[in-house]
């Protein structure tokens, strides 16, 4: 079998034999050093491009925030701070002030509320104000105010603090249950909910002079303030009650002509023929404005009559209900799913439209057409029938209808179809993927149009190897302004598909170079892409793993702005200037921010994270090319041990999931709470290898063997690996493959599997408890890649199940589960435990009480990371085994340890 390495890979191996004599080797990092390391958090750039902010999170969990002036280099730094925002005039910054991780843990243990502060920073002189007990905050669009919301008190209201930025004055509004600022930032709407209810109402505050317009007041409660998108109209709801019913009903209010003389309209369901009897306007659906402000959409649902009091003489025992769930084979969805969706189902609403000027109400969804998607202009709704093709054991299918919001007229759009991808911003088109092409439905003309039949490329996702009936597309990247077209992706490129029937245009040229281009949105204010503005694209080398950004300017030649053997991501632009920031990293270069101008000629490093790394030995990463047993070209990311010495053989740990070679340039911060951490292992003298896996239908486990084994053998041939000291590990799907691979080969000397699937038949019949849905769909249409139910292809299920091949295992296996795992039930681990125990084969299972699919508790993260290291170090490095490895731990010993801690 032929293994293929690139020339660059082989050359790097050869160059590794050049000894740099005279240089003292740097020490490898130890677990005591881990707390020195930082993670670069989210970043932002002010609208004028003069200020950049970024977060730093240390390994111990504490946050810091930095703000830097791009002209002077001046830096503000703050501990335990996060969530920064800049005012639109770039004169101010605000941020959340929190606590250290230890303080937060202490308050949580003492059941004290964790309440944050807000810092307001004057960027010109560095002066600041601190505001206590602030839950959320934001600058108004016109940069006149910082608006802060306090925490909800016992009366379900909060204080609202309005800080006038130029004067520093703070206005306090009390008893506020809800507030919202319009887009321009000059008007604040708020709801007052006073304790005695006499002062309840909705008011509109002019932020320029603090004059107040009273929109409505009553002893009733109000809710659901909703501004129209441009801030020119407001809607809200007013509660009223009927003693015959359990829930409140609501009146709708709209306020238009906000800037002149407010035009206030109201609709009451009381006595209205438009609202069916025993139904009410529901608070669960926040009203939605149409684009022209002529229609308000709202939700309606059943109004529950108050229960009739029990007749006298009825005993309490008779009134008690059994603690019973009835699982019925006709249930759709099944009981666990119904429990998960209870709140959603309980707040379900039917969609109605209030046409304000005509004061008419139209019902848009009902018991048959249950859900609706409002089009961009609000003149139509795409409604779906969810019940016709259920239960859906594979892909879910629906009938879709177009409903006119003025007349209620319904027209069939698509029958027995999986999904509508969306509608255009102006509301003319619905877009969907059918027969491997993108289609539009012209709502105005009532026509279906195949938009890509003549485009010389493939839009369906050829990389999707799941057993779906219909392959999904590579996706779209957005609509053009005025519905003049949309952007569609193929495997490598982005195409502009005009809606006027003219020829499609390929915007990028990635196919020829193996570069994957995708649109990068730098301005999210509009819900469309303006072709009269520069267009930016991310670029990723499918083969060489380079990355960067590409620009198509309005005028001039398209060009690659930055493209390197690094992971270059998170491009952002200052709103009002041509200043850009991006993030750059490799496995050996800590992530940093870079600032650049329009030409991208000389990016300047803004941050310097993890400077201490220079004091320690650090590994490097290289790309491996190989072929699986079927001759498919695949790749893997190989990470060298720190202080690698040419000519010496090293142990290696292989980490698997699906496609992993794209992690080649991902920097990995060491951590005592990260069990599968690449740097943790390279600093201990291991190679770490992450190969790609592709799949054959109905053979997920065997496919993994066919990719992983030849890949590892190819790396062994370099002479750098001690073939008797190779470990294998993975989590979830990677853990399944880990457990299965060791049934087919003795290539590995130890294996670690976190939450593995063990028995594909019993797993097929299990529930995915996190969602409450059966696992069958995952197997037949998704990651499981077993197209049929187990009773139709039982041999394949058994042949790809670790449990049914367990007698072949000779590799020591460490498995971990949480008892509340809602993805892979921990009884999968028990099945393997009892099987391996009966076979008298080495198997250790760590069971973490109360944990879900991934460990969340700090103490458990620390423990699992430690045990994974100890397990591999014993089996691969030959260290003395801990007692838990040789003989486990008795339950009575565990209880005695817990009792000591409690004392």
What is each stretch, according to the model?
Residues 1-25:
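Bacterial Sec-dependent N-terminal signal peptides
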Residues 12, 22-579, 585-591, 595-596, ...:
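Beta-propeller folds
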Residues 153, 195, 241-243, 643, ...:
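Short strand->helix junction
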Residues 283-286, 341, 484, 539, ...:
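Hydrophobic alpha-helical scaffolding
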Residues 284, 293, 378, 435, ...:
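Active-site lining segments that contact anionic ligands and/or coordinate catalytic metals
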Residues 386, 540, 585, 655-659, ...:
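Glycine-rich His-Gly loop
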Residues 454-467, 600, 608-725, 729-732, ...:
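Cap/lid segment of the alpha/beta-hydrolase catalytic domain
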Residues 668-903:
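Active-site-proximal cap/loop segments of hydrolase catalytic domains
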